[in-house]
Amino acid sequence: MRALGAVITLLLWGQLFAADFGNEVTDIADDSCPKPPEIANGYVEHLVRYQCKNYYRLRTEGDGVYALNSEKQWVNKAVGEQLPECEAVCGKPKHPVDQVQRIIGGSLDAKGSFPWQAKMVSRHNLVTGATLISEQWLLTTAKNLFLNHTENATAQDIAPTLTLYLGRRQLVEIEKVVLHPNYSEVDIGLIKLKDKVPVNERVMPICLPSKDYTEVGRVGYVSGWGRNSNFTYTDHLKYVMLPVADQDKCIQHYENSTVPENKIPKNPVGVQPILNEHTFCAGMSKYQEDTCYGDAGSTFAIHDLQQDTWYAAGILSFDKSCTVAEYGVYVKTFNILDWIQKTIASN
């Protein structure tokens, strides 16, 4: 007896016994274990309970307990013969980050605090980021997907040119790319993998938010494979803690970064990010360290202390700040939640 990767355990010994050996479920014949003694005015009922492996949880409207009826069918009181499913746990890293460490010139993430972080390599070995949001889907920016492609490139053209790694450089195959229908204003794309990835300590999706976590002052963490203080790509995942900034100040900062008539840079940035109702800004930390080239596509991860769960509040779109600008710019995940869910459901 098996059920979608679940482990089945016997609640009361009887004619059928299902045991858990490691992650395998083994049936034992009727005569392999003694029958329970009879009791006066009572009877023996055979029950099994479905449980999930580590890093998965049971999804069912019932309680996961099934009884053997007179027709030798396993049924649950609430859902009948319908079996439960084991869905991947999200936003529950085994080793959550517990101190401030940074991307630019910072310390390393040696503990797997960001198991949703993916490393994406595009044409000509340009490194960017992507964020695992389910067993088979990742978020990244449209700009990342179009790197070294013409503006006329299609999603079908782009997908074969990407290489994607999860966990400890686990290579995963890409099935397709889906661009946001308004990607010039909403810098987002989805990546679908050919197969679901096993969820474990090093590979785990981050949860999608059910509310907007981007109020000014909220602190989040951004991990990344982008360039370090020497402007060379790092071989190790690093991270930074940054506060959400005032949007008006952020807009004013970038509006003043160029002279409108001839676009002569007034500061080292000189590039205009996309800023609109779908974006928010995160400011420089007090350590004067920041995200940089190659970190785009990574998530602004928020730890909801009440739920003890990590949520993807945003996706880094503008990663050109590199300590010379005050703000990085992110796409609000909550604003595109409906598109994400509909796209995944229809694909």
From Swiss-Prot:
GO cellular component terms given for this protein: blood microparticle
Positions of glycan attachment: N148, N152, N182, N230, N256
Signal peptide: 1-18
GO BP field: acute-phase response; defense response to bacterium; immune system process
GO molecular function, one term: hemoglobin binding
PANTHER family hit by this protein: COMPLEMENT COMPONENT 1, S SUBCOMPONENT-RELATED, HAPTOGLOBIN-RELATED PROTEIN
Organism: Oryctolagus cuniculus (Rabbit)
Protein's name in the database: Haptoglobin
UniProt remark on domains: The beta chain mediates most of the interactions with both subunits of hemoglobin, while the alpha chain forms the homodimeric interface.
Peptidase S1 domain span: 103-345
